[in-house]
Amino acid sequence: MKESNNYWYVYIILCDDNCYYTGITNNLINRFTKHKNGKGANYTRSHKPLKFLSAWEVDSVNTALSIEHYIKSVNKKIKVLFAENNRLLKQYYVRDIKNKGKRDCNSISVRSVSKKKLNSINTLLNN
């Protein structure tokens, strides 16, 4: 399964203690493998990653970083909503940045990675 490195991904991973980890990458498979092997973020060294719950494709690292920061700022109840229905992220994120008057929301491109693709990636990673 080849991924395009022209895009960045924001993702939520379920960890073994039922907590969520949010991060960014330009390659979902390689990044998860690093997390799983203890070479990713410090957080996933002590909270073992199990699978991707949600992921979104964006056009730039700056957008990815901004969305990652936003997801990390919301409570777990909202993160659960994003994990269950990944199409909600863009709606919530755009509303948040509009309220803060930060940037032009019309230029933001956030595409949900399908549950089918995530399931395929999770299956591949667990074999």
Q: Where are these predicted regions, by residue range?
A:
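Arginine/glycine-rich "motif VI" loop of SF2 helicases in the C-terminal RecA-like domain
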Residues: 42-48
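Residue-level detector of flexible, active-site-proximal loop/helix-junction positions
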Residues: 39, 59
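GIY-YIG nuclease catalytic motif and its immediate N-terminal context
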Residues: 1-37, 48, 52-55, 65-69, ...
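Short arginine-rich
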Residues: 42, 69-83
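Residues at or immediately preceding the N-termini of alpha-helices
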Residues: 28-29, 60-63, 76
